[in-house]
Amino acid sequence: MEIACLDLEGVLVPEIWIAFAEKTGIDALKATTRDIPDYDVLMKQRLRILDEHGLKLGDIQEVIATLKPLEGAVEFVDWLRERFQVVILSDTFYEFSQPLMRQLGFPTLLCHKLEIDDSDRVVGYQLRQKDPKRQSVIAFKSLYYRVIAAGDSYNDTTMLSEAHAGILFHAPENVIREFPQFPAVHTYEDLKREFLKASSRSLSL
């Protein structure tokens, strides 16, 4: 029994915060876990900036509604779901993800939750647990699943290390250099091949 675990942003959909930064012209919101590996530090910075500019959840959702999955992502998810159980492990928030998950056919998503006040202001967030992607992989392994994981960033590397097989996809050069133990690919066709290679079953493209 095998489970495919995928990161969401940068792997299947654009980086939501980068798209939001471009739309609002606030460059400081372009920082991601690629730049600031400590997610808690990154989120506190984002919330402070949102507050300084008076931006509410509705403003962010408006931008997300204009985003589309990366080219080829929908077909890739369909291909993967025919061959594996698929779970998206993401550091996004349920409040952000709905429009994009709909376009991907609503695969299972494990992520975090925002805290919103009565005026639609983002006042905080609830992380599901510490190192949630790795903890999810540990849980799947305890159920005797073989886990193959793919991600693009620092915050994916503990998940990739914990999985039976880890794959870097669309990762920047600094992450590829720092984690040479993982195969690094940049197209969905190559990612399919890595999943087939990592599988304990005899599967075809």
Curated annotation (Swiss-Prot):
One of its GO terms (cellular component) is cytoplasm. Its cofactor is Mg(2+). One of its GO terms (molecular function) is 4-amino-4-deoxychorismate synthase activity. Its EC number is 3.1.3.3. Keywords: Amino-acid biosynthesis, Hydrolase, Magnesium, Metal-binding, Serine biosynthesis. The keyword Magnesium applies. It holds the Pfam family Hydrolase. Signal peptide: none annotated. Pathway: Amino-acid biosynthesis; L-serine biosynthesis; L-serine from 3-phospho-D-glycerate: step 3/3. Phosphoserine phosphatase that mediates dephosphorylation of phosphoserine in the serine biosynthesis pathway. Also able to dephosphorylate other substrates such as phospho-L(or D)-threonine, with lower activity. Shows phosphoserine:homoserine phosphotransferase activity by transferring the phosphoryl group to homoserine using phosphoserine as the phosphoryl group donor. NCBIfam families: HSK-PSP (TIGR02137), PRK13582.1 (NF010109). Belongs to the thrH family. This is Phosphoserine phosphatase ThrH.
